[in-house]
């Protein structure tokens, strides 16, 4: 698949286009231009390194939304075996913006739950652009309860702009469904490891992200509101989104410094979409390390640790003036 480049990546896109053109010429010519191709490839790689070493929060937001970024099912295919999808909330409907089912991770039975966006127009509409309705969150709750019953660890993958704000969703209890999930996750008697793989949009993300360990991919985001939404409220213009992204502190490094996430999983050069298999390999190691941390821990110790972790959120430090 041809890589889609973002606006700020245009210098890289131009170099890559030149490289592709030279490769095409080389295939149809006796002239050896391999040295020039190698030189331009190194230049492109260095340019990518320099660009990605100095990303703004707004640019990170764009990468988190990249249309070719791996979604939940991509990671399911790479990280898990024997996946069997489970459907429906047993109350109203089956919301396809949240997917989940039984699987094995490194041979161990587990439950997998995650947001799922679409790759084309038809699938995006089918998945509601990754914005769950109440029945999606109730499906997630059902699967969490099932995992708890059989003592299975839970892996969740977060990638949503937010919970769907439609009238029907509100009528069916959107806020209640999210709130109930927060309560359920806080009380679960089995480990839950959450990973933010793209957009972590407000309560829509939090509803499957209250974990014993929260991981975050290097170029993903996690925030109470989108930069555009924040800008529209504060400055009455979505054009101020870059400033809003800076103020929101939505990047992995900022959230790690605040203690809101536990680990940052580095991405391949250029983002997860440039090397999905490489990204999956790095994430596999991080998930295995996190799961190992909770194996052998008693239920009481697990829940007490989770409680203390949740209670630590929002604490602040007092400093002397001028410190």
Curated annotation (Swiss-Prot):
Principal location class: cytoplasm
Catalytic function, reaction form: N(6)-carboxybiotinyl-L-lysyl-[protein] + acetyl-CoA = N(6)-biotinyl-L-lysyl-[protein] + malonyl-CoA
GO terms, molecular function: acetyl-CoA carboxylase activity; ATP binding; carboxyl- or carbamoyltransferase activity
Domain CoA carboxyltransferase C-terminal: 39-293
Top-tier EC class: transferase
Any single biological process term in GO: fatty acid biosynthetic process
Keyword vocabulary terms for this entry: ATP-binding, Cytoplasm, Fatty acid biosynthesis, Fatty acid metabolism, Lipid biosynthesis, Lipid metabolism, Nucleotide-binding, Transferase
Subcellular location: Cytoplasm
Domain of life: Bacteria
GO cellular-component term (any): acetyl-CoA carboxylase complex
Matching Gene3D superfamilies: 2-enoyl-CoA Hydratase, Chain A, domain 1
The protein's role, per its UniProt record: Component of the acetyl coenzyme A carboxylase (ACC) complex. First, biotin carboxylase catalyzes the carboxylation of biotin on its carrier protein (BCCP) and then the CO(2) group is transferred by the carboxyltransferase to acetyl-CoA to form malonyl-CoA.
Family from the record: Belongs to the AccA family.
Name of this chain's protein: Acetyl-coenzyme A carboxylase carboxyl transferase subunit alpha
Organism (species): Paraburkholderia xenovorans (strain LB400)
């Amino acid at each position: 698949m041809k890589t889609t480049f973002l606006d700020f990546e245009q210098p890289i896109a131009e170099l890559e286009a030149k490289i592709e053109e030279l490769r095409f010429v080389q295939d149809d010519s006796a002239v050896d231009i391999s040295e020039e191709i190698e030189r331009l490839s190194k230049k492109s790689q260095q340019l990518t390194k320099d660009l990605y070493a100095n990303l703004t929060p707004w640019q990170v937001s764009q990468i988190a939304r990249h249309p070719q970024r791996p979604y939940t099912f991509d990671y399911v295919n790479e990280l898990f075996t024997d996946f069997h999808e489970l459907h429906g909330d047993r109350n109203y409907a089956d919301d396809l913006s949240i997917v989940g089912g039984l699987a094995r991770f490194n041979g161990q039975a587990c439950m997998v739950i995650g947001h799922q966006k679409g790759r084309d127009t038809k699938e995006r509409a089918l998945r509601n652009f990754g914005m769950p309705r109440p029945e999606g969150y109730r499906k997630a709750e059902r699967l969490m309860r099932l995992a708890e019953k059989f003592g299975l660890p839970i892996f969740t993958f977060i990638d949503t702009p937010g919970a769907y704000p439609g009238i029907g969703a509100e009528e069916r209890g959107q806020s209640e469904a999210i709130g109930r999930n927060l309560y359920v996750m806080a009380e679960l008697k089995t480990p839950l490891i959450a990973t933010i793989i793209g957009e972590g949009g407000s309560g829509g993300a939090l509803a499957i992200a209250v974990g014993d360990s929260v991981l975050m991919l290097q170029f993903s985001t996690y925030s109470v509101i989108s930069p555009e939404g924040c800008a529209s409220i504060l400055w009455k213009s979505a054009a101020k989104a870059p400033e809003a992204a800076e103020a929101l502190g939505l990047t992995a490094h900022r959230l790690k410094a605040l203690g809101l996430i536990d680990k940052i999983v580095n991405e391949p050069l250029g983002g997860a979409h440039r090397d999905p298999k490489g990204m999956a390999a790095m994430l596999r190691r991080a998930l295995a390390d996190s799961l190992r941390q909770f194996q052998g821990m008693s239920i009481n110790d697990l829940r007490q640790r989770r409680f203390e972790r949740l209670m630590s959120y929002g604490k602040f430090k007092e400093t002397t003036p001028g410190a």
